[in-house]
Amino acid sequence: EVGQHQMWSAQFYKYKSPRQFLTSGGLGTMGYGLGASLGAKCAFPEKTVINIAGDGGFRMNMNELATASRNNIPIIEIIINNSVLGMVRQWQTLFYGKRYSNTVLDDGVDFVKLAEALGCVGYRAETKEEFSKALSTALTLNKPVVIDCRIGKDENVYPMVAPGEAISKAFDASDMK
């Protein structure tokens, strides 16, 4: 996966051992995560496999939930859903004068109903408490689960590097004031 959710996952999840974080890095592979998580679960059936995706990336290959259900592959898909292409919108905010173009995903797709229609379990979380409860329950199930986590469209991730700049020029939110 690629996007804000990828950076948050790298920054804030406490990994306990090597090879727990499968990532494409910054190669722009939206939608990579769901298929990769199915492969990881098949390779290591004894491991808990969780994919963290943005709602834009999830839409790229959401049909793979049918594969998970049909083949009884119990992965957990956490969707960080801000109803926009978050990283693209953040760049448009910071570097293009808030000229937003083609980033809004407000077509009303209900990821919980989609999960259920494809034979998976679906939960929606709008608070930390709802997320904790959904994740705790998902970890006890032996079936594919989708957790649709709603966040605000203006949540940004830092540090950030401007287009064409070197990594040494990375900046944080505090630099924006």
Could you tell me what each predicted segment is?
Residues 8-14, 33-35, 62-64, 87-92, ...:
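Short acidic, glycine/serine/threonine-rich loops at helix termini
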Residues 43-134:
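Conserved thiamine diphosphate
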Residues 15-20, 91-99, 166-168:
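Short glycine/proline- and charge-enriched loop/turn segments
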Residues 6-7, 28-30, 58-59, 83-87, ...:
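Short gly/pro/ser/thr-enriched loop/turn and capping motifs at secondary-structure boundaries
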Residues 1-35, 40:
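Active-site diphosphate/adenylate-binding microenvironment
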Residues 128-177:
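Glycine/aspartate-rich loop-and-adjacent alpha/beta segment that forms the canonical ThDP
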Residues 23-29, 97-106, 170-177:
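A short acidic, glycine-rich active-site loop
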